[in-house]
Amino acid sequence: MYELAGELLTLSIMAFALGMDAFSVGLGMGMIQLRFRQIIYIGLVIGIFHMFMPLFGMLTGQLLSGWLGLLATYIGGALLLVLGLQMIIASIRKEDKPFIAPVGAGLVLFATSVSLDSFSVGLSLGIYGSHVWMTILLFGFFSMILTWLGLLLGKQVRSWVGSYSGALGGIILLAFGIKLLFPL
């Protein structure tokens, strides 16, 4: 009983930490003009990706070495750099619509970039032998809720900073991409 409670607490803390990545990206994405329905949908998609990426990581964690997790983190960082730069350039050019919108393939790109780190964690948890269902449900739940909070807060910040919101959102994504590529 205590062992299960300890694992639940540990996985919840881990899920919250990974969800903060989704919050940060949501904050940047929220500065793009989004409808409430899109915000709900984006949160759901990112939550689902945060369930499947660690699941895939857990399943392959027993087969592959740790280098794949590091590679996934670098790919995620590079994607966020590109997305952030694109948002900044679009803002400078005064383009109304971002080049990569958070719908369709653009949303898959956003969700993939923010959930690649959960794949890396899944690799480690797969080797450790963590409870699969508890892990993926907690990861999905926390990332979905924190994405919604980030998107809603980003939408509010957008109304405060006006035309600079796209550049600010791009800077947030760019900074987060740099953080993934060059951890302290």
Swiss-Prot record:
<feature type="transmembrane region" description="Helical">
    <location>
        <begin position="63"/>
        <end position="83"/>
    </location>
</feature>
<dbReference type="InterPro" id="IPR022929">
    <property type="entry name" value="Put_MntP"/>
</dbReference>
<feature type="transmembrane region" description="Helical">
    <location>
        <begin position="164"/>
        <end position="184"/>
    </location>
</feature>
<feature type="transmembrane region" description="Helical">
    <location>
        <begin position="99"/>
        <end position="119"/>
    </location>
</feature>
<dbReference type="Pfam" id="PF02659">
    <property type="entry name" value="Mntp"/>
</dbReference>
<dbReference type="GO" id="GO:0005886">
    <property type="term" value="C:plasma membrane"/>
</dbReference>
<keyword id="KW-1003">Cell membrane</keyword>
<keyword id="KW-0813">Transport</keyword>
<feature type="transmembrane region" description="Helical">
    <location>
        <begin position="39"/>
        <end position="59"/>
    </location>
</feature>
<protein>
    <recommendedName>
        <fullName>Putative manganese efflux pump MntP</fullName>
    </recommendedName>
</protein>
<keyword id="KW-0812">Transmembrane</keyword>
<dbReference type="GO" id="GO:0005384">
    <property type="term" value="F:manganese ion transmembrane transporter activity"/>
</dbReference>
<feature type="transmembrane region" description="Helical">
    <location>
        <begin position="132"/>
        <end position="152"/>
    </location>
</feature>
<comment type="similarity">
    <text>Belongs to the MntP (TC 9.B.29) family.</text>
</comment>
<keyword id="KW-0406">Ion transport</keyword>
<feature type="transmembrane region" description="Helical">
    <location>
        <begin position="12"/>
        <end position="32"/>
    </location>
</feature>
<keyword id="KW-0464">Manganese</keyword>
<keyword id="KW-1133">Transmembrane helix</keyword>
<dbReference type="InterPro" id="IPR003810">
    <property type="entry name" value="Mntp/YtaF"/>
</dbReference>
<keyword id="KW-0472">Membrane</keyword>
<comment type="function">
    <text>Probably functions as a manganese efflux pump.</text>
</comment>
